[in-house]
Amino acid sequence: MSSQQQQRQQQQCPPQRAQQQQVKQPCQPPPVKCQETCAPKTKDPCAPQVKKQCPPKGTIIPAQQKCPSAQQASKSKQK
């Protein structure tokens, strides 16, 4: 039994150390990458999103349809 207990202890030791190292290594990279990707990602998508929304602007289609009626109403009121 003593041989089995020693083997179990040895097996448990390496995994625990490996887990600690693995946890520390990945833990540090994610935050660093997060900040790096966060800044560029927010800037890159921000510009493209604004530009992309401008050309398609699904709101413009309905707005244009309402625009004529709104302009006519404002003109009729002005007159």
From Swiss-Prot:
Describe PTMs of this protein. Cross-linked to membrane proteins by transglutaminase.
* Name of the featured protein: Small proline-rich protein 4
Write the gene name: SPRR4
Region annotation Disordered: where it falls in the sequence: 1-79
What family is reported? Belongs to the cornifin (SPRR) family.
Name the job this protein performs: Cross-linked envelope protein of keratinocytes. Involved in UV-induced cornification.
Low complexity compositional bias: what residue ranges? 1-26
Question: Where is the protein localized?
Answer: Cytoplasm; Cytoplasm, Cell cortex
Instruction: Report the principal subcellular site.
Output: cytoplasm
- Keyword Cytoplasm (UniProt): yes
- Renumbered to this chain, the Polar residues biased-composition regions fall at 66-79
Q: Which GO terms describe its biological process?
A: keratinization
